[in-house]
Amino acid sequence: MKLKDTLNLGKTEFPMRAGLPTKEPVWQKEWEDAKLYQRRQELNQGKPHFTLHDGPPYANGNIHVGHAMNKISKDIIVRSKSMSGFYAPFIPGWDTHGLPIEQVLSKQGVKRKEMDLVEYLKLCREYALSQVDKQREDFKRLGVSGDWENPYVTLTPDYEAAQIRVFGEMANKGYIYRGAKPVYWSWSSESALAEAEIEYHDLVSTSLYYANKVKDGKGVLDTDTYIVVWTTTPFTITASRGLTVGADIDYVLVQPAGEARKFVVAAELLTSLSEKFGWADVQVLETYRGQELNHIVTEHPWDTAVEELVILGDHVTTDSGTGIVHTAPGFGEDDYNVGIANNLEVAVTVDERGIMMKNAGPEFEGQFYEKVVPTVIEKLGNLLLAQEEISHSYPFDWRTKKPIIWRAVPQWFASVSKFRQEILDEIEKVKFHSEWGKVRLYNMIRDRGDWVISRQRAWGVPLPIFYAEDGTAIMVAETIEHVAQLFEEHGSSIWWERDAKDLLPEGFTHPGSPNGEFKKETDIMDVWFDSGSSWNGVVVNRPELTYPADLYLEGSDQYRGWFNSSLITSVANHGVAPYKQILSQGFALDGKGEKMSKSLGNTIAPSDVEKQFGAEILRLWVTSVDSSNDVRISMDILSQVSETYRKIRNTLRFLIANTSDFNPAQDTVAYDELRSVDKYMTIRFNQLVKTIRDAYADFEFLTIYKALVNFINVDLSAFYLDFAKDVVYIEGAKSLERRQMQTVFYDILVKITKLLTPILPHTAEEIWSYLEFEAEDFVQLSELPEAQTSANQEEILDTWAAFMDFRGQAQKALEEARNAKVIGKSLEAHLTVYPNEVVKTLLEAVNSNVAQLLIVSELTIAEEPTPEAALSFEDVAFTVERAAGEVCDRCRRIDPTTAERSYQAVICDHCASIVEENFADAVAEGFEEK
């Protein structure tokens, strides 16, 4: 036997290297085979419910890192709730209708307009489901736990039927109407868009300043007067039917030198416009209030058949332009509103593809709307006063990345104005985890217009509307519920497979159809109505969930998307918000803080992270950032997170190894019998437990990460475990001092493993597999630990906080001695302490082997005065010299009692007593050489 064999060196097969990329899939298969998700739900039956409703990602392509961050965050929350006494099932979902899938099929050579619609929709469905399968595997690879066998998918018959019923209730309440209002129109998608489908980019446009000649001045203006107009959309002049002025804006009638014509512009803009137009010596002839110009009639710049009426509008400002805007009711919301109020014609001169139509005039017909500027300039002739290129923020189709236009076309709308105040009242009841989120959603609802819900596409849920022979739209409870039942049984494709009469209830009649003939709507619903109905299709309809949901958690872009549409439909149907809390996240940016994009080559695929680091590192990264704001991610950042993971893993490995001979049922030492330092560490750990439990409850992942890393680095590695080897390795295997420390080790190990489970489930399960005395076969079936409080807790904490200050001062003294070459390692030191009464009392209260805590071989508490050479602090001073004696081959301390024993061992008296008591045979035979 060798002397080193008398040491209690930690033993474990728990590997230092995690091997996450290969081990994680093995664990995941084991969880699936064991039906772990189902077992957890069964275990929590009857407990308080917690419903985190999954916002459905769009089923197209592999997941990106933003998806991963979001789903991991949800998984951490659901797992922590499940381990905190809540019944918290998780139903993942997918959004599957819409233009992107049509675009994919088009790129694959599928020609929608050349094939049977039902066959085309079948191809869309097959593709969507293939993408669901792909993303399902992506999410499962992240270790996300949920009912993957029974997700919700927006194309399933039961979901589509639930969506129809949401629409039906809104129709019954009078919230659905048809109108020809201007809507966001995407010529690149050939469809109307909702606000949520718009994104803004800078666009360079040609702006024109031109003049309309007065035709009837109403006794205010002469007919040789021209009203100056500004536009950034020259194509809309073809549909201009009025000029709008601000009622309270001052306008001036002016005549520049050398100019026979007189012009009207906003007084405030005269100076800048004169410079722009090259006017000199401008004479102001008259000043008018805008309301005085109301109902003056002007000529259209070139269309003699059209008159343009001067009208009043609150949207007119003097921030730019001329203070007068031309008004084309068919091409703008403000234009439409003031145009309708003044009985102006709603002319639309651009078709669904962005091509100018016949009513624009023969010179324009057939041209793309963006290309007509030269023709407009030619038609304006000497009415054009100036042109310039401007860069401004402009709406784009978020899918095709092409600019859009406002265009008045017959569309179906969901009224928001009819119940806007109800929605705003409900927002006040929702808990937002960021105040700016509440303000953002509130302002969006307050300021938004009615919701255009119809789309001129194929792949989506049909609007369940019929038309009578006289054109009357039919959407009554009887017909809508019948359609819902048909969809529930056959899916929405039946809408296209059957004639209108076969989609109506048997024997249905309508006074507008004396001959019993009906037509059906061919538009589909906005996909935001699809996902915005999920509270009904999933939360209400799945018995394991509760409505309203406890939490919606998505990216901050969903304030205008899913948060918004879900809120509108839920309040419209039931008068309540669909969620009790909203938690939003920022976007994942690259390591430099730049937006990720394939074209820039700065994207990070979750699959690449899994191959290089493992999903655990991605999961740990999610907790290491403040995801309420935009966050950065790169392979370098993940490498740093991987180092943190390694530190956590190896610290827990040390605890596993040094409790391998510890049976908690037999060897646990009661708290009251622990040493003061062990009590202190127990209290500190319970503070960590409380911090983490509270942070899980508040979804504060970064708090968990910081607290955990700080505890492992500062409390454990830099202190408790730093001197632990002097106890757990050196003392007798069954000694009280060793069992005291092992009691703390084991308590921390078991509980910290549970605390880590929501974040690092693979690692937690691997650790758990080494804890043979724990009852649950999987740590995921256990509960998060509760924080315990102890007697005299504050007193103990105060004592050890003071000791930590003392320790820091002692370490400075040792460092100075090391720099002066007095000692090398701290174990070579004899530290003499010159305390005042406060420190003397402190060291007595610590009631521990202070030399052991400071990792020095000898420590003396001096009574004599402090020598001049001492390193002095306010309450204490230190001197350091080399310890007397020789190095003990067993404990490595320098000790005066170190000597060669008769059993061939050079050890100190303390080690000799341990060896002689516990290894009698080896003592009798003598130890082998090193």
Curated annotation (Swiss-Prot):
Q: Which UniProt keywords apply?
A: Aminoacyl-tRNA synthetase, ATP-binding, Cytoplasm, Ligase, Metal-binding, Nucleotide-binding, Protein biosynthesis, Zinc
Where is ATP annotated to bind?
K598
E.C. number(s) listed in UniProt = 6.1.1.5
Q: Which Gene3D superfamilies does the record match to this protein?
A: 1.10.730.20, HUPs (3.40.50.620), Ile-tRNA synthetase CP2 domain-like (1.10.10.830), Valyl/Leucyl/Isoleucyl-tRNA synthetase, editing domain (3.90.740.10)
Name the Pfam families on file. Answer: Anticodon_1, tRNA-synt_1, zf-FPG_IleRS
| Binding sites annotated in the UniProt record for Zn(2+) | C888, C891, C908, C911
| PANTHER family referenced in this protein's UniProt entry, alphabetically | ISOLEUCINE--TRNA LIGASE, MITOCHONDRIAL, SOLEUCYL-TRNA SYNTHETASE
Protein name stated in the entry: Isoleucine--tRNA ligase
Annotated source species: Streptococcus pneumoniae (strain Taiwan19F-14)
Q: What is the lineage of its organism?
A: Bacteria, Bacillati, Bacillota, Bacilli, Lactobacillales
